[in-house]
Amino acid sequence: MSQWYELQQLDSKFLEQVHQLYDDSFPMEIRQYLAQWLENQDWEHAANDVSFATIRFHDLLSQLDDQYSRFSLENNFLLQHNIRKSKRNLQDNFQEDPIQMSMIICNCLKEERKILENAQRFNQTQSGNIQSTVMLDKHKELDSKVRNVKDKVMCIEHEIKTLEDLQDEYDFKCKTLQNREHDTNGVAKNDQKQEQMLLQKMYLMLDNKRKEVVHKIIELLNVTELTQKALINDELVEWKRRQQSACIGGPPNACLDQLQNWFTIVAESLQQVRQQLKKLEELEQKYTYEHDPITKNKQALWDRTFSLFQQLIQSSFVVERQPCMPTHPQRPLVLKTGVQFTVKLRLLVKLQELNYNLKVKVLFDKDVSERNTVKGFRKFNILGTHTKVMNMEESTNGSLAAEFRHLQLKEQKNAGARTNEGPLIVTEELHSLSFETQLCQPGLVIDLETTSLPVVVISNVSQLPSGWASILWYNMLVAEPRNLSFFLNPPCARWSQLSEVLSWQFSSVTKRGLNVDQLNMLGEKLLGPTAGPDGLIPWTRFCKENINDKNFPFWLWIESILELIKKHLLSLWNDGCIVGFISKERERALLKDQQPGTFLLRFSESCREGAITFTWVERSQNGGEPYFHAVEPYTKKELSAVTFPDIIRNYKVMAAENIPENPLKYLYPNIDKDHAFGKYYSRPKEAPEPMELDGPKGTGYIKTELISVSEVHPSRLQTTDNLLPMSPEEFDEVSRMVGPVEFDMVSMTRGRS
C-alpha cells in the first residue's frame, strides 16, 4: 500500500495538513499521478548531490511524458492540459536548480510520514486520552451554544412574522372601523363600542408582542456575546498558542475547519439579526405610538449587533500559515533577505458575499515603535506582489483565504557606514508582518488587521541556527504577537519548558524525540548536577555563552548534532540505536556489567560541528575490572565518505604486529552487532571497470575499501587472546593496506572526547 493511498484514508483534519504541504512549486496533482514512483526514489540523496538531482529531475519529466501519453489514449483533454502545464512549471522553476526540487519533494514525503504517524498515534490514544475527552466535551458544549444562537434567531424570525401578521390585522380593523364611521348609515353605538374595545385589546396584544420580540433580541444578543467570548477569548487563543508550539516543532496544530464553522454560524446569525432589525423598523414606520418598544430600543440594538459582528469579523482574520521560506520548511519565522517566503491568511467567517471582496495588503513593521526607539534597528522593504484578494477557489478546502507566495525582503541601506552599536544582535532583532483589508457592505464598513508572529531576518544562512534559537525562545515563553523588544531583557526559561522544546527539535525532523535519560544529561549540562524541572536557564546560557569549558554555546552544539542526524544518522536514530546524550559516568555504569565487546553510540561533547563516537567495554584476562575504550569522534567529513554502519562493521584495532580485530560485538544492551546494523550495511558494488579492455587477461582494477583502524599499544588492550601474532609477510601486507592515503580516513584513538 503506497504512502499516498494511506494518506487519503485519513480524517479531514489530517488531510488538511496534507493539503498545506503542496502549492504551485510542486503541485499535488503530480504527487497524485506519480505516487508510487516518487516514493521509490532516494530524494534525500538527490537533495545533497547535484548530479543525482539532475538525473532525477529529468526522470520526473519523463514520467510526466508517460502520464501524458496515457491520458492521450484516454482522450482526456483536461488532464493532458494539466500535465503539460505542470511540466512547464517544473522546467521554469527547477531546470537550473534541480536540488531545490529534490529538497521540496524530500521534505513533502517526510512531512507526509509525520502526518501518518501522528494520525496513527491519535487513533491509538483517542479512546483513552483524558485530555482529548475533556477537549471533546468542551467542543460539544460550545457546539451546543452555537446551535442555541442559531435556534434563537430562527425563533425570533417566527415571532417577527407573527408580529407582522398581528399588525396587519390591527391596521386592517382600524381602517375598517374608520370607514364605517364615515359611512352615511353609520354604526350603532353599541357595535362601535364593542369594536373599539376589540381594537384596544389588539393594541395591547401588539404592544406586548413588540416588547416580547425586542426582549428576545436582547436575550439573543446576550447569549451571542457569551458564545462569542468563548470563541474569541478561549478557542481562538488556544489555537494561536497551539500554532506557536507547532511552529517550533510541537504537535501539529488542529485544523481551523471546526473553528471556522462556529465563527460562520454566529456571523450568519448576526447578519440575520440585522435583517430582523430592518424589518422592525419597517413595522415601526407603518405604525408607532408613545412608548413604542421598537422606537425606544432600536438604536441600542443596532449598535450592539454591529459591535458584536465587528468584533467577530475582526477576530476571524488570522494568519493560518506563518511566514516561512520553502527552502527551510521546518524553520518558519526565520527569513533571509533576497529569498522568497510564503504566508497564508484566512477569514474564519466564510460568507459567500465576501468571496473576492476583501483585498489584503501586506506591510512590514507597521507601527513598530522599535524602529525609532532601538538603536541600530534595521528597516526593510517588501518586494513581490504585496496585495492579494481573498477567495474560496485557491484553497483546497474551500476556505476564504489569501496566500502570498512570492514575497521577499530587502534591507534599506542608510547613507554612511553601518554601526553595530545597537543593544540587539541581528538574530535577536524581532520584526513583524502586518496584513490589512476592509469589509464594505451596505451600511457597514469594518477595517480588519492581523499580524504574524515575530520574525527574525537574516542576511546569511550561517545565521539561521541563532535565528531559530530566538524563535524557539520567544514562542516558548510569550503568547503575545507584538512584543518585539523581547530580547532587550529576555526572561529565563524553566527546564520543564525547555526540555520539551528540545525534544520537539528531534521529533519534528525524525521519528524519535529525547527520552528522560537524554534530557537529564542535557539538563545537567545547563544547570549542573542539581538540575530540576523548575531550574531556570538564562537566554545567554542557552545560546550565547560557551558551555562549561568548551568554546561554543549549548544551542549551536545541539543544532550541529541535529544536522548530523538528518544527513548521516537518521535511520540509526529512528531505530533507537543511538544512546546519543549520555554522561561519561552514566556510560560506564551501563557498560561495566556487560559482556566484553558491548558498545554504545553517543555524541561527542567536545566537537562544535557535531560528531558521534562509540565506546566499548573489555575486561582483563582474569575477569577483573572493566576497561573502557572510546574512538575519536566521527564528523560529517568522515560520514560523508563512509556510512556509520559500515564504519562499525569494518572497524579494527591493531596492536603491534597482531592481526587487526574488530572489538565491537554487541550493541548495548545485548544486541548482536550485525543484527542491529546489518540492514544498513552497504551492498556489494558493481564489477570494477577494466584497466585494459583489450589486454590479454582483461584484468580490472583491484577493489579497495576504506576502513577505520585504531593503532594502539598492546598495554591498552586487556583482551589479546584473539589478536594473533603475524608473520612478517602478513604485517607488510596489512601495513600496505593501511597506507598513508587510507590513513586520511583512519581514526587514531586519542582518548575520550
From Swiss-Prot:
UniProt-annotated site: Required for recruitment of EP300/p300, residues: L724
Crosslinked residue numbers (Glycyl lysine isopeptide (Lys-Gly) (interchain with G-Cter in SUMO1)): K703
Residues forming coiled coils: 136-317
Any one GO CC term of the record: nucleus
Primary localization: cytoplasm
Originating species: Sus scrofa (Pig)
Keywords linked to the UniProt accession: Acetylation, Activator, ADP-ribosylation, Coiled coil, Cytoplasm, DNA-binding, Host-virus interaction, Isopeptide bond, Methylation, Nucleus, Phosphoprotein, SH2 domain, Transcription, Transcription regulation, Ubl conjugation
Subunit structure: Homodimerizes upon IFN-gamma induced phosphorylation. Heterodimer with STAT2 upon IFN-alpha/beta induced phosphorylation. The heterodimer STAT1:STAT2 forms the interferon-stimulated gene factor 3 complex (ISGF3) with IRF9. Interacts (phosphorylated at Ser-727) with PIAS1; the interaction results in release of STAT1 from its target gene. Interacts with IFNAR1. Interacts with IFNAR2. Found in a complex with NMI and CREBBP/CBP. Interacts with NMI which is required for CREBBP/CBP recruitment to the complex. Interacts with PTK2/FAK1. Interacts with SRC. Interacts with ERBB4 (phosphorylated). (Microbial infection) Interacts with African swine fever virus (ASFV) MGF360-9L; this interaction mediates degradation of STAT1 through apoptosis.
Phosphotyrosine found at: Y701
Gene: STAT1
Entry's Gene Ontology BP terms: blood circulation; cell surface receptor signaling pathway via JAK-STAT; cellular response to insulin stimulus; defense response; defense response to virus; metanephric mesenchymal cell differentiation; metanephric mesenchymal cell proliferation involved in metanephros development; negative regulation of angiogenesis
Domain SH2 residues, every copy: 573-670
Compartment(s) where it occurs, according to its Swiss-Prot or TrEMBL record: Cytoplasm; Nucleus
Positions bearing the Glycyl lysine isopeptide (Lys-Gly) (interchain with G-Cter in SUMO2) cross-link: K703
Sites bearing Phosphoserine, chain numbering: S708, S727
Protein name: Signal transducer and activator of transcription 1
Classification via Pfam families: SH2, STAT1_TAZ2bind, STAT_alpha, STAT_bind, STAT_int, STAT_linker
PTM sites of type N6-methyllysine: K114, K175, K296, K366, K525, K637, K665
Family: Belongs to the transcription factor STAT family.
Cited function: Signal transducer and transcription activator that mediates cellular responses to interferons (IFNs), cytokine KITLG/SCF and other cytokines and other growth factors. Following type I IFN (IFN-alpha and IFN-beta) binding to cell surface receptors, signaling via protein kinases leads to activation of Jak kinases (TYK2 and JAK1) and to tyrosine phosphorylation of STAT1 and STAT2. The phosphorylated STATs dimerize and associate with ISGF3G/IRF-9 to form a complex termed ISGF3 transcription factor, that enters the nucleus.
Modifications the protein undergoes after translation, according to the UniProt entry: Phosphorylated on tyrosine and serine residues in response to a variety of cytokines/growth hormones including IFN-alpha, IFN-gamma, PDGF and EGF. Activated KIT promotes phosphorylation on tyrosine residues and subsequent translocation to the nucleus. Upon EGF stimulation, phosphorylation on Tyr-701 (lacking in beta form) by JAK1, JAK2 or TYK2 promotes dimerization and subsequent translocation to the nucleus. Growth hormone (GH) activates STAT1 signaling only via JAK2. Tyrosine phosphorylated in response to constitutively activated FGFR1, FGFR2, FGFR3 and FGFR4. Sumoylated with SUMO1, SUMO2 and SUMO3. Sumoylation is enhanced by IFN-gamma-induced phosphorylation on Ser-727, and by interaction with PIAS proteins. Enhances the transactivation activity.
ADP-ribosyl glutamic acid carried by residues: E657, E705
Modified residues (N-acetylserine): S2
Modification type Phosphothreonine: residues: T749
